[in-house]
Amino acid sequence: MDRRSWLWRRKSSEKSPGETESTGSVSSHSERFSDDQRSQSPELNSKPVTREEEATADIKILTERLSAALLNVSLKEDLAKQHAKVAEEAVSGWEKAENEAAALKQQLDASTSKVSALEDRNSHLDSALKECVRQLWQGREEQNQKIEEAINNKCKEWETTKSQLEARIEELQARQDVTTSSVHEDLYPKLEALEKENSALKLQLLSKSEEVKIRTIERDLSTQAAESASKQQLEGIKKLTKLEAECRKLRVMVRRSDNSSDLKSSIDNQSDYSGRVSFSDNEMQSPSEKIIGKSSMATSVDIGLMDDFLEMEKLAALPHSEPGRKHSESNKELEKSNAHVNQLKHELKTSLRRISELEEKVEMVEVEKLQLEMALNGSKEQIEALQSRLKEIEGKLSEMKKLEAENQELELLLGESGKQMEDLQRQLNKAQVNLSELETRRAEKLELTMCLNGTKKQLETSQNRLKETERKLTELQTLLHLTKDAKEAAEDGLKAANGKTEAIESRLKDVEAEAESLILKIKSLEDVTEKERALSAKHNSKCNELQDEISKLKQELEHHQETEPAPNHIKGFELKQEKELAVAASKFAECQRTIASLGQRLQSLATFEDFLIES
């Protein structure tokens, strides 16, 4: 109302300067006209004018007056129109203000009704909240009772398990003590004896190993000596072969010189010597092949053979012009060679003796080696037996360790059970803390309810103020905003309720659809039962007919048998009738079976119908 009146005043104040300007212009024209009259009056008095001039002047004055009057009239009409427009605008503004006031009153009424509805809803919500709080407390109390019962049960179980474990630990400790005492009594003397035997065997092994090392060193030395001797013998044999070749050359030279029979005899002796030497070579080669690398030869044989070889080369280098000198020198050289050959034979015999001695020594060494190997094998067997005994002892010790580990595990289980008891106590403490927190929350909820009551009182006072102060639109706007928020909350609640109702309705529809489908199924089952009943009736009728036919056929057969003797064709007819009777009997049995199956199906359908009716 104030705003509309202020706008109307502002418009009138804005239009007032135009009015003042128009009035000012009219007054200025009137002043000018009066001044003209005043200025013209002395002229009329002073100057004589004609009537025509006066008339024209009067006409001009009148026209000017008319124009001024017309101007004043037009200005007044404009002012009147402006005043009318302002009045119309003021009336329309007043009407609009009244309409707005009515709309605001309606809004206030609607807001008051909404506030009352919200108060009712708030009361319902308070009651629902109280019920929820009560249910929460009941659920929490039940939960706490269940927790306490579970904790007590667990504590009892842990106590029983603890007592069982303690008893088991005591039994195991007793067993361990008994086993350890028995094992110590049995094993300690055995261990001491085995340790003594092991130390003695170790000493024997060390001594035998040292002996074996010494024997192996001796054998290696003897083999090295034999190898060197065999090498020297081979070198001597090679030198002898070279000497034979030189002797043959000398024979050829003697034949050329055509000397006497002395040379021939010497040559024969030489051939005998060569045969002996070859025989001795063969004898030397056979033991050299048997034994390679044994005993050392004297260096004197090698030196003599080298001297003979040099002398033979000198003889070959002499010219052929001196046959007599050659013959004498050759005889001397042959004698010398025979002497050397005899020496070589003697040395070969000595070397063969030494080789045989070395062979005997080698055989002795091998026998001793075999004996040592046998002793080693025996010692190894004894060591293996001792190791097996040690393994058995270690197995028993490992069993003892396992028992100790089991005892430790049981102790760990006891420690874990104690830890679990501590954890349960902690959980109890946490549950007590949660109970205290719940109590604090309950107190907070009570405070919130008190605050809600205070807000209700404030709402009542604000409603009274709204009734008293209808002009305070700003407060109404704030209250309208609050009511809008409450309206939105109420609408949300209504939407949630509508959603729940829709869900319930959809569920009801589903249930109705299921019921309809079940009804349809029942109807179909009833139709099936009726059909099966009709079929059973038909089968019964057919069975009765077949029974009648069978009875008639039997009567006819009996009548024929009584009246006439049966010829062959009658017998065939009777056989056919009997076959037909058998077929009819089989059909009758099948009909009875179908009837029984139909009866069972009817019973099952009846039970199913009863179940559907009960459900």
Swiss-Prot record:
Keywords: Coiled coil. Residues 1-55, 258-289, 319-343 are annotated as: Disordered. It is found in: Vesicle. Residues 19-28, 39-48, 262-288 have a biased composition (Polar residues). GO terms for cellular component: cytoplasmic vesicle. GO terms for biological process: regulation of exocyst localization. Residues 1-18, 29-38, 322-343 have a biased composition (Basic and acidic residues). Residues 87-121, 148-211, 327-563 form a coiled coil. Pfam families: FPP. Belongs to the FPP family. Interacts with WPP/MAF proteins. Binds to COG2; this interaction promotes the association between cortical microtubules and EXO70A1. PANTHER family: FILAMENT-LIKE PLANT PROTEIN 3, FILAMENT-LIKE PLANT PROTEIN 4. This is Filament-like plant protein 3. The gene is FPP3.
